[in-house]
A protein has these predicted regions:
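A short SAM/SAH-binding and catalytic strip from SAM-dependent methyltransferases
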Residues: 154-170
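Core SAM-dependent methyltransferase catalytic element
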Residues: 245-275
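Short, glycine-/aromatic-enriched active-site segment of Class I SAM-dependent methyltransferases
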Residues: 194-211
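Conserved beta-strand signature within the Rossmann-like core of class I S-adenosyl-L-methionine
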Residues: 156, 175-194
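Short amphipathic alpha-helix with an adjacent loop that forms part of the alpha/beta core around
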Residues: 143-153
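A short, conserved alpha-helix within the catalytic core of class I
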Residues: 135, 165-178, 182-183
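Short alpha-helix
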Residues: 210-240
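Rossmann-like AdoMet
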Residues: 1-90, 94-136, 151-152
Length: 275
C-alpha cells in the first residue's frame, strides 16, 4: 500500500457498500488472539478510510462470521493454484479484498480483480496493478469484459459474497460464459438459499447498505442443471467448513441448533465445481 496517511472518504450505497462490512470484519479479526484469517492488510486499509464503521454492525465478537468464509475460499484457491502453476484467476466482485496479497500466487498466474468502476478506482489507490496482477473496471454481469481475458490456460473463478446480489439470469449467464470460454478450470463461490433471500431484512449489514439480494440457490443440483459442463467437487454448509470449529463457542452452539432444520443449516453454502 502507499505510504500516504491521509484518509480517503468512501461513499458507496447498495451492494458495493456491503464490501465495507466484510472489510471491517477482517480488520477486527486480525487483532484476535487466535485469528482465523489474520488479514493485516484489511486492518491497514480500514485505518486509511473515512467511513462510519458502526454502520456495518460488525464487532469483534461477530467478525469471525465474516472471516471464516474468506479463510475457506483462501484454502480452496490455494489448492487450485498448487496444481496449476500456470493459470488465470478471475476474482469477481473482489471489493477491497486483499486475497492476491494473502495468497501471493507464483509468476505463472495472471490474476484479475474485477468489480464496479467506483470500487476499482478506490482499490487501485491501495493495491496498484503489476505484471501479473490486473484490475478490471466492469460489472461482472456485463460479459464483454471476459473478452479481454486470454483463454489459453485453466481458470479459477472465485466469487465470495457475490452470487446473492445477482439475478438468477445474470448469474447463470456469467457461469455459462466462463465454461464456454475457458478450456478448463474451477468455479468457487458461496450462495444463500431461498430462505436466506426471503429473510434478508434480518441481515443488518445488507439492510443498512440499502442492498438487495436476489438469487437464492437451495443446492448444487440447481447449478449443475442450468450450467452444462460442470462437475460438482464440493458443496457444504458454512457450519461444516473446517474453520468453523475455531469460531467462538456461542456460534458453534447456534450452528448445532440451526442444523436441526435443513433450510437453516443450508442458508449459507460454499460451492466448488470443475469443468
Amino acid at each position: 500500500m502507499h505510504g500516504d496517511t491521509k484518509k480517503i472518504r468512501v461513499d458507496f450505497t447498495g451492494a458495493p457498500e456491503t464490501m465495507l462490512a466484510t472489510l471491517y470484519g477482517r480488520a477486527l479479526e486480525a487483532d484476535a488472539d487466535r485469528p482465523i484469517l489474520g488479514d493485516t492488510y484489511a486492518k491497514e486499509l480500514v485505518q486509511r478510510l473515512d467511513y462510519d464503521w458502526a454502520k456495518t454492525a460488525i464487532t469483534a465478537k461477530n467478525a469471525p462470521s465474516v472471516t471464516i468464509r474468506s479463510a475457506h475460499f483462501d484454502g480452496w484457491a490455494r489448492q487450485f493454484l498448487a496444481v496449476h502453476e500456470e493459470a488465470t484467476v478471475l476474482h469477481v466482485g473482489c471489493g477491497l479484498d486483499s486475497r492476491f496479497l494473502r495468497l501471493r500466487p507464483g509468476p505463472g498466474v495472471d490474476w484479475y480483480d474485477v468489480d464496479y468502476p467506483n470500487v476499482i478506482a478506490l482499490r487501485e489507490q491501495f493495491y496498484p496493478p503489476g505484471a501479473s496482477y490486473r484490475l478490471m473496471s466492469a460489472s461482472v454481469t456485463e460479459l464483454d469484459w471476459l473478452s479481454a481475458v486470454p483463454a489459453d490456460r485453466p481458470v479459477l473463478v472465485l466469487g465470495e459474497g457475490l452470487t446473492m446480489y445477482l439475478t438468477k439470469e445474470s448469474g447463470l449467464a456469467l457461469l455459462r460464459r466462463v465454461v464456454e470460454r475457458f478450456p478448463s478450470g474451477e468455479l468457487q463461490f458461496d450462495v444463500f438459499n431461498r430462505l436466506g433471500i426471503r429473510t434478508q431484512i434480518l441481515n443488518t449489514p445488507v439492510r443498512r447498505a440499502g442492498a438487495r439480494m436476489h438469487w437464492g440457490v437451495d443446492g448444487p443440483d440447481e447449478i449443475l442443471r442450468d450450467v452444462p459442463g460442470l462437475r460438482l467437487l464440493v458443496a457444504m454448509s458454512v457450519f461444516d467448513a473446517e474453520g468453523f470449529r475455531d469460531v467462538p463457542r456461542r456460534y458453534r452452539v447456534m450452528a448445532r441448533v440451526m442444523s436441526l432444520v435443513p433450510a437453516l443449516k443450508n442458508m449459507a453454502q460454499f460451492h466448488r465445481y470443475a469443468f
